[in-house]
Swiss-Prot record:
Highly expressed in beta-cells of the pancreatic islets. It is found in: Cell membrane. This is Kin of IRRE-like protein 2. Residues 1-20 form the signal peptide. Its main location: membrane. The keyword Cell membrane applies. The modification Phosphoserine is found at residue 571. The gene is KIRREL2. It comes from Homo sapiens.
């Protein structure tokens, strides 16, 4: 029943309203509005079925119902009131106009929804601190600060541009400068400028909703930067010994004030300016050349190393190695060069390559491996010299003993035996031994041992020693026995035998006697010929007429014996005249004899000799005897053949010799002129002459003796 009554009531109500007319209502209500400061704001309002009073309120304050809104000079209402149009206009809009506005139909009790009026204030052009030209130092971090001041609404956004390109926002940040003043903001751009940033343009733009295009402020960077250096070398690849020119170029703000050159960190003395000329060597490969350029801001340097081609240079030489027999040995050496050298190992004096590389290994060495090993480096480029270094391998082994040649010795004279010892390690002792004894050092009876270093060592066998065994007063047994020289060290013992050779005195004495006899004979022949010729020239007339004898008697005491040739005598008248010479030591006395005077005043003893000189006597009698007999036995060659020399004597009319030469008074007349060579005082057996082979028979008659 109740459900049926409700629709009926609604129908009746609708019919009643239709007869009374439409009620007042809003055809258009104001909406929120954003207006730039200084522009016009329009808030629309339209009512339907209302012909009463319409007014606007500002944040609840009624502005009035008249169209021109008295008291609000910048406000007015426009539109056809009959049509219900009541729009509110504000021009120019100011910041104080920002409020909430409502359109009200007072008599109908209608109020529109509130409309918020927002007044936008465009930002002013920002300011960059230090602009329009900002001076910075290249390489030093710096900040660019941009500020926007004023009552800009909303708060502006500050953006940075470089050469028209927006920079990343991560490089700057924005700060509100004053609370309640949204327009006062600041933006800081952090950057590290470089030399290429000199003259660059940076733009700070303040942008907001009030001014979407924003306002810009531009600045220019003026950079001070240390020198930027470029170092070049010409040529860059050279051979050792060639010239190289380094050129150091730099750009700087402010200008360059100085250059400094260095090589391997050490200053190059005398180098100034941007150009350096050098002669390349191997050190330029590992020691770069650097150029440092300075100005008021700072300094910068660049360095470069040359590609120097050079031959091998020894960096680590091989060290001597000493090992025992059977152990391994190794050598190592290091070379450098450009290009890298080829390293090989050989043995000194050999051509066989034992190995290559920096290390040579010799397994289980023996004594034959001892010696000098050569580490040789060959240049990797033709035209470059190689190099070599040596090291000695010493193989520790038992001593090596060698008997040295010893000179033969005379019986009962001194003798010496020597041996050479090489050993590594050095021998503990060197011992001489023979049948009945041994001696290491010092003396023992007739034996004396001396040991001293050898002048040279044999490669790889260790230092050398020479041990000498001296024997005084040799005996027959010394020439038949063996002498042993032995040496020992911690690895063993070595030895060698030496024997003593015997030397015969006779051949030497014979040679000396022959030479002395020949020399004496030659001198006497020359003297006789000279005397003959001289007398012949002085008394040729007298001697040609007379054939008397010139007789030289013995000494005044009459002790001299006369030979058969002296028995022929004559009267004083038969002998002819007495001849006196100025250059002879023979004086003819009144008795017809020649007296001998000592020309040496007694320094040499001249024994008296009686010689009969028969002038013109036929050969074969008196002074002229048969040719001398040889000094040796028949069938053996004589020491000196007198005949060839005496045959060369020119003929002398004084002697009228038919044989053509002067003979000796006795076959051994010249033996007394032989003077044996002294060989030292040997021990002689009792009753034995010192040199039995030099004791010649004494002639049976006196001989003329003098000193040669």
């Amino acid at each position: 029943m109740l459900r049926m009554r409700v629709p009926a009531l609604l129908v009746l109500l609708f019919c009643f309203r239709g007869r009374a007319g439409p009620s007042p209502h809003f055809l258009q209500q104001p909406e929120d509005l954003v207006v730039l400061l200084g522009e016009e704001a329009r808030l629309p309002c339209a009512l339907g079925a209302y012909w009463g009073l319409v007014q606007w309120t500002k944040s609840g304050l009624a502005l009035g119902g008249q169209r021109d809104l008295p008291g609000w000079s910048r406000y007015w209402i426009s539109g056809n009131a009959a049509n219900g149009q009541h729009d509110l206009h504000i021009r120019p809009v100011e910041l104080e106009d920002e409020a909430s506005y409502e359109c009200q139909a007072t008599q109908a009790g209608l109020r529109s929804r509130p409309a918020q009026l927002h007044v936008l204030v465009p930002p002013e052009a920002p300011q960059v601190l230090g602009g329009p030209s900002v001076s910075l130092v290249a390489g030093v971090p710096a900040n660019l600060t941009c500020r926007s001041r004023g009552d800009a609404r909303p708060t502006p956004e500050l953006l940075w541009f470089r050469d028209g390109v927006l920079l990343d926002g991560a490089t700057f940040h924005q700060t509100l400068l004053k609370e309640g003043t949204p327009g006062s903001v600041e933006s800081t751009l952090t950057l590290t400028p470089f030399s290429h940033d000199d003259g660059a343009t940076f733009v700070c733009r303040a942008r907001s909703q009030a001014l979407p295009t924003g306002r810009d402020t531009a600045i220019t960077l003026s950079l001070q930067y240390p020198p930027e250096v470029t170092l070049s070398a010409s040529p860059h690849t050279v051979q050792e010994g060639e010239k190289v020119i380094f050129l150091c170029q730099a750009t700087a703000q402010p200008p360059v004030t100085g250059y400094r050159w260095a090589k391997g960190g050490s200053p190059v003395l005398g180098a100034r300016g941007p150009r350096l000329e050098v002669v390349a060597d191997a050190s330029f490969l590992t020691e770069p050349v650097s150029c440092e350029v300075s100005n008021a801001v700072g300094s910068a340097n660049r360095s470069t190393a040359l590609d120097v081609l050079f031959g091998p240079i020894l960096q680590a030489k091989p060290e001597p190695v000493s090992v025992d027999v059977g152990e391994d040995a190794s050598f190592s050496c290091a070379w450098r060069g450009n290009p890298l050298p080829r390293v090989t190992w050989t043995r000194r004096g050999g051509a066989q390559v034992l190995g290559s590389g920096a290390t040579l290994r010799l397994p289980s060495v023996g004594p034959e491996d001892a010696g000098d090993y050569v580490c040789r480096a060959e240049a990797g480029l033709s035209g470059l010299r190689g190099g070599a270094a040596e090291a000695r391998l010493t193989v520790n082994a038992p001593p090596v003993v060698t008997a040295l040649h010893s000179a033969p010795a005379f019986l009962r004279g001194p003798a010496r035996l020597q041996c050479l010892v090489f050993a590594s390690p050095a021998p503990d002792a060197v011992v001489w031994s023979w049948d009945e004894g041994f001696l290491e050092a010092g003396s023992q009876g007739r034996f004396l041992v001396e040991t001293f270093p050898a002048p040279e060592s044999r490669g790889g066998l260790g230092p050398g020693l020479i041990s000498v065994l001296h024997i005084s007063g040799t005996q027959e047994s010394d020439f038949s026995r063996s002498f042993n020289c032995s040496a020992r060290n911690r690895l063993g013992e070595g030895g060698a035998q030496a024997s003593l050779g015997r030397r015969d005195l006779l051949p030497t004495v014979r040679i000396v006697a022959g030479v002395a006899a020949a020399t004496t004979t030659l001198l006497m022949v020359i003297t006789g010929v000279a005397l003959c010729c001289w007398r012949h020239s002085k008394a040729s007339a007298s001697f040609s007429e007379q054939k008397n004898l010139m007789r030289i008697p013995g000494s005044s005491d009459g002790s001299s014996s006369r030979g058969p040739e002296e028995e022929e005598t004559g009267s004083r008248e038969d002998r002819g005249p007495i001849v006196h010479t100025d250059h002879s030591d023979l004086v003819l006395e009144e008795e017809g004899t020649l007296e001998t005077k000592d020309p040496t005043n007694g320094y040499y003893k001249v024994r008296g000799v009686s010689v009969s000189l028969s002038l013109g006597e036929a050969p074969g009698g008196g002074l002229f005897l048969p040719p001398p007999s040889p000094l040796g036995p028949p069938g053996t060659p004589t020491f000196y053949d007198f005949n060839p020399h005496l045959g060369m004597v020119p003929p002398c009319r004084l002697y009228r010799a038919r044989a053509g030469y002067l003979t000796t008074p006795h076959p051994r007349a010249f033996t007394s002129y032989i003077k044996p060579t002294s060989f030292g005082p040997p021990d002689l057996a009792p009753g034995t002459p010192p040199f039995p082979y030099a004791a010649f028979p004494t002639p049976s008659h006196p001989r003329l003796q003098t000193h040669v």
